[in-house]
Amino acid sequence: MIEDNINNNENENEDKNGNGNENENDKNNKNNKFEALLMQSPISQSTPFIFPSPKINSNILTTEPLTTQLSSSPTTTPSLKKRKPKTVRNPFIGPSSNKTKSNFPEFPSWTFEKNNNDFCQGGLSIKNKHLFTFDDNNNNNNNNNNNNNNNNNNNNNNNNNLNINFNNRSIYNNYKNNNNFNQSDDEDCEKDNDRFLNSENFDEEEDEEDEDDCTNKNFEWSIDMLATIMPVNITLDNQQNNLNSTNNSDNGYESSTELFEFKKWKIEDEKKSNDYFSRPTIYPHVKINNQNNQNNQNNSFLFKSSKTNQSIQQLQQQQQQQQQQQQQQNNNDNNNNNNNNNNNNNNSTLTSSNSLSGIKRKSSGSNYNSEDDTYSIEKDQTGVSAFVDDILIGDINLSSISSIGGGNSGIVFGRPTIFNTPTHFNTYIYNNNNNNNNNNNNNNNNNNNNNNNNNNNNNSGSNSKPIIAKRFPNRPQFPECLEESFSINLNKQSQNNNNNNNNNNNNNNNNNNNNNNNNNNNNNNNNNNNNNNNNIKIINNNNNDSDIFLTPMTPVKITSVTKSTRKSKYNFHVTDPLILPDISPIKIKHPITPTQINSNSSNNIVSPSSSPSKKFEYCKF
């Protein structure tokens, strides 16, 4: 019996050994199929893998974990085809053609729910779903669903570690989960037909042309929408004011006319906007008087306002009275030759023009009375009238001012440089008789005539009252810093009378001593020196420097004669080229200061031209 049992056991062992060999062959075949499937998958084609080697231990089949070289870059995703390069759509052109049915403008992607994948397809074609869900139940349901999905995925991972499934999806899931490839669905919204991806949440019927990356939707606002929010400021660079003819010829077009039209439009546009918002405009409005423009062809302009008209009449009356007084005194004391000399001297004085005219402005048509091409100036209006209030400006010479459009018919962009009428504050104008005295001394041979001429010239200089260009009529006419100079000027008549008596005595002595030639010449020279000292040489006829410029509204200290450091109380620069015109001080040639009075002889006043390099200061009130 024992032997029979041993034989039976041996037979059973042989059967088992035979069955074991058969099982090993079957398992080897299965392993070959496993490797073939992996080689066919896109994962094996793209990256080299280390395939697991199944081991048999106690009839339990186990596998080693998958390892790959891509474990350091978990963001890469496999695909069956090459993806088309993404085209970033311009966010300022509005939505694409298939999205016009939705509201405009598009909402950026950060406003969408991250877990709702339908927002990524087609912008706002969201199929009856809300952009912002404030319902707690919906949020909880979404979270629960996500948690359930995660739990299921973890269970599947554990099962895959224990049991090898030979389908492609389980292989990919095992590979993905073991290498931490957890890709969210909202990171990529493009169409993909890869069978190894979870593509249930993607719309496969969507056109590829309308595919957009959700990250590019952060600035999807139209340019029209932005234009309503952002202010638009049109500025003109000051460097564009260089209107050289060479530059214009190189460009091939008339850039000066374009610049003129632009500035003209800017002035009118800001005028309209300022009127609409009831703001004071910084641009003057000068009404053109067509009749005066036809009568005056010499480019003599005046700023016309209510008080300037009164000041014009007052100054003209003062000039007429002064001329009448001079003529009466000259007729009583002078001969015919002396009268001729006095007439010549009177003709040399500067007078303002009696006619008024407005600032001309370039017009598109011939009718200058149209409202579009004319302006009106008013009292207390900001702009130029604020600087020319209560002051006479006569014979403004615009010949040296560059105007755009050719000639003097255009708007003057720049500051005026020449004023023929002296408008310096408290400026005295006397007849400069130096040339006349020299001519009389050289031409006349009679000693008595020479003496009479000199005496008459002294009378004309002493009796002529100063013409004051009055800027502030309500303020004291004689400031403290000029009292001494005014007192000297007021005592000129008595001083000159004494000089006349001395001259007559000298003439009598010369006639009695029969030394007419020598002594009279000496006396003439002395008289000429007296005349030179009595006459303030504000206007130099030899050099034709008869241009005195305006002072600032408030006297300030100025060290440079070419530039003013005054700050305007209005919100604009004095040197703005768009102001018509800017009469800020450019150059003041002959100011009067007490420091220029000769301390030795109180009868004489040193001419300012004798010390041009000496600095001066304005008088403060």
UniProtKB/Swiss-Prot annotation:
UniProt superkingdom: Eukaryota
Biased composition (Low complexity): 1-10, 63-79, 137-182, 309-347, 431-459, 496-539, 597-613
Disulphide bonds in the chain: none
Polar residues bias spans: 348-357
Residues covered by region (Disordered): 1-29, 63-100, 135-194, 307-374, 430-471, 492-539, 594-614
Protein name, as recorded: Putative uncharacterized protein DDB_G0286333
Organism of this sequence: Dictyostelium discoideum (Social amoeba)
